[in-house]
Regions:
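Short terminal hydrophobic/aromatic SLiMs and anchors at protein ends
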Residues: 20, 27, 31-39, 48-49
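Basic polycationic patches enriched in arginine
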Residues: 5, 14-19, 25, 41
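Charged docking surfaces used in two-component/phosphorelay signaling
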Residues: 243-423
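Short stretches within intrinsically disordered, low-complexity N-terminal or propeptide regions
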Residues: 26, 31, 66, 427-428
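Single conserved hydrophobic/aromatic residue that forms the stacking wall/gate
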Residues: 1-15, 421-429
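Solvent-exposed polar/charged
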Residues: 4-5, 82, 228, 276
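N-terminal Rossmann-like NAD(P) cofactor-binding subdomain of oxidoreductases
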Residues: 45, 51-261, 293, 368, ...
Length: 429
C-alpha cells in the first residue's frame, strides 16, 4: 500500500508495482531481495522518489568477467564501469595472466577507444580455471573466453554446477537444447527453460544463458515484428567488421583496403541460430521453428566496428503483405520485454528507420542509443522477393558485450539471478 502511494496514480506503473509484489509472494525466499529491490526500485526511480537506502537495500550484484583480457572482455569492463546494478569484483583469465595486475596485462593491447578505467588497473587477475575461487566471490559471471568449443562448454558447466550463473558471449552452448539463446527484445520468454536446465545440472542457482551471434543482431530484430504477418523466406548478406574477429587494423593490417568473402562458421550460425530464437519450449527443451527459411552469406569488410546486412524477404503465398508504410510503422513502434522493463542498457527505441537513401551508415549510426539500437533503411519492393532493405548494428555492443549485459539485466529483473546472502548481505535481508 505504501508502494502504491509512492508510485502514484499512473496506471501502467501502479499495475506493474502490484504485479511485482504478487510475484514476490510466490517466489522462493532467496529471490525476494532481488525482485523487491531491483524491480520496485526501478519504479521508484521512474517517479524520481528519493528513498536513501532506508526503505530499500541498494546493494549491487557482484560480477565476474571470465576472459577479461580479450577484446570482448575489455568491452565488458568498460560497460560495467558505472553500471547501476552490477559491480565487477573478479577479473578472470588464463593461467599465464593469473596473479598479475590487470593494467599490466592489457598494457599495449588495450583495444578500446576509451582509456582503461583506474578502478581496474590494480585488480589482480584470477585463473579462470579456479572455478570455486571465482564463484565464491560473485553473484554471477559474464564469459567471453578464447578456447576450443568443447573446453568452453565444459568450463561454463563447471561454473553453473558451482552455483554461479553464467551469461555467455561464447557460441559453445548456443545449441544445447535447454540453454536459452536470447535477444531480450525478441524471445525473453525462453529464459523459462532455465528451470529445466537446473534440473539437468542438479543446481539451485547455477545455469547458463547465452546471447546469439553478432551477425544476426541487425537483421533478425528487423524481421521479428513482421514474422507474425507471414514472412517465410529470408536472404541476408552480411558485411562484418574486423572487431568481430577480435582484431583491429593494427593487429590485422591485411584487412586495410581489402574484403574477404569468407568467415568460418558464420553463415551456418546466421542461418540456424534465428530458428532457435524463434522456436518454442517443448518437453524440457527449445525446439527450432520450421516456418521460416534463411540463407546467408557473410563477408569480412575493412570496418572497425559495426555489422551491416542487405536483406531480402518474402511473405507466404495467400497472405496480404503489408505496405512499405505499414512495415516502417511496425518497426518504429515495436517494443520488446527489455523496453517494457526499462532495463538500464535497453534502447528506448529498439528499431530506428532512416528515410534518407544513403542511410544507415556505420559511422553515423553504430553508436545510436549507446550502440544498442538497430538501424534500418532503404526498404523497397524487390523483383524476386517481396521486399529488400538494409540494416546495421554495433557488433561489440548490441552484438556482443552490450547484448550480454542486457540479457543479464533481464535475468536479474525476472528473478533468475539473485543476490547471494553472503555475510555482508545478510544484514540487508
Amino acid at each position: 500500500e505504501i508502494g502504491v502511494r509512492l508510485v502514484g496514480s499512473e496506471m501502467c506503473i501502479r499495475d506493474r508495482f502490484v504485479r511485482l509484489f504478487d510475484k514476490a509472494r510466490h517466489c522462493k525466499t532467496h529471490c525476494l531481495n532481488n525482485i523487491i529491490f531491483y524491480q520496485i526500485r526501478q519504479l521508484l526511480f521512474i517517479k524520481n522518489i528519493s528513498f536513501g537506502g532506508i526503505v530499500v537495500n541498494q546493494k549491487k550484484f557482484k560480477v565476474g568477467i571470465i576472459g577479461a583480457t580479450g577484446m570482448v572482455g575489455q568491452r565488458f569492463a568498460l560497460l560495467l564501469e558505472n553500471h547501476p546494478w552490477f559491480e565487477v569484483k573478479v577479473l578472470a583469465a588464463s593461467a599465464r595472466s593469473a596473479g598479475k595486475k590487470y593494467g599490466d596485462v592489457v598494457e599495449g593491447r588495450w583495444h578500446m577507444t576509451k582509456d582503461l578505467p583506474e578502478k581496474y588497473k590494480d585488480m589482480v587477475i584470477v585463473d579462470a580455471e579456479n572455478v570455486e575461487e571465482v564463484a565464491s566471490q560473485v553473484d554471477f559471471c559474464f564469459c567471453a573466453v578464447n578456447m576450443k568449443k568443447d573446453e568452453i562448454k565444459a568450463l561454463e558447466e563447471r561454473y553453473a554446477k558451482a552455483e554461479c550463473p553464467i551469461v555467455s558471449n561464447n557460441s559453445a552452448h548456443r545449441f544445447t537444447p535447454d540453454v536459452p539463446m536470447v535477444i531480450p527484445e525478441i524471445n525473453a520468454d525462453h529464459i523459462k527453460i532455465i528451470d529445466e536446465q537446473r534440473k539437468r545440472l542438479g543446481t539451485k542457482r547455477g545455469f547458463i544463458a547465452v546471447k546469439s551471434n553478432c551477425s544476426l543482431q541487425s537483421y533478425v530484430p528487423a524481421i521479428h515484428p513482421l514474422k507474425e504477418l507471414g514472412v517465410n523466406k529470408v536472404l541476408a548478406c552480411t558485411y562484418q567488421a574486423i572487431s568481430g574477429a577480435g582484431k583491429t587494423f593494427k593487429t590485422w593490417p591485411e584487412m586495410i583496403d581489402n574484403v574477404i568473402p569468407y568467415i568460418g562458421g558464420e553463415e551456418e550460425k546466421s542461418e540456424q541460430e534465428p530458428l532457435k530464437i524463434w522456436g518454442h519450449i517443448e518437453n524440457g527443451e527449445i525446439v527450432k521453428t520450421d516456418d521460416i527459411a534463411i540463407t546467408a552469406q557473410c563477408i569480412r569488410v575493412p570496418v572497425s566496428d559495426g555489422h551491416t546486412a542487405a536483406v531480402f524477404m518474402s511473405f507466404k503465398d495467400g497472405v496480404k503483405k503489408p505496405s512499405v508504410e505499414e512495415i516502417i510503422k511496425i518497426w518504429e513502434s515495436y517494443k520488446g520485454r527489455a523496453q517494457e522493463l526499462e532495463l538500464p542498457s535497453a534502447p528506448k527505441q529498439f528499431l530506428h528507420y532512416f528515410t534518407e537513401p544513403d542511410r544507415p551508415q556505420i559511422k553515423s549510426e553504430r553508436n545510436l542509443e549507446n550502440g544498442m539500437a538497430v538501424s534500418v533503411g532503404r526498404l523497397r519492393e524487390d523483383t524476386q522477393y517481396d521486399y529488400k532493405f538494409v540494416c546495421m548494428s554495433h557488433n561489440t555492443l548490441r552484438g556482443a558485450a552490450g547484448g550480454a549485459v542486457l540479457l543479464a539485466e533481464l535475468l536479474c529483473a525476472e528473478g533468475y539471478i539473485c543476490l547471494l546472502y553472503t555475510s555482508d548481505a545478510a544484514d540487508d535481508k
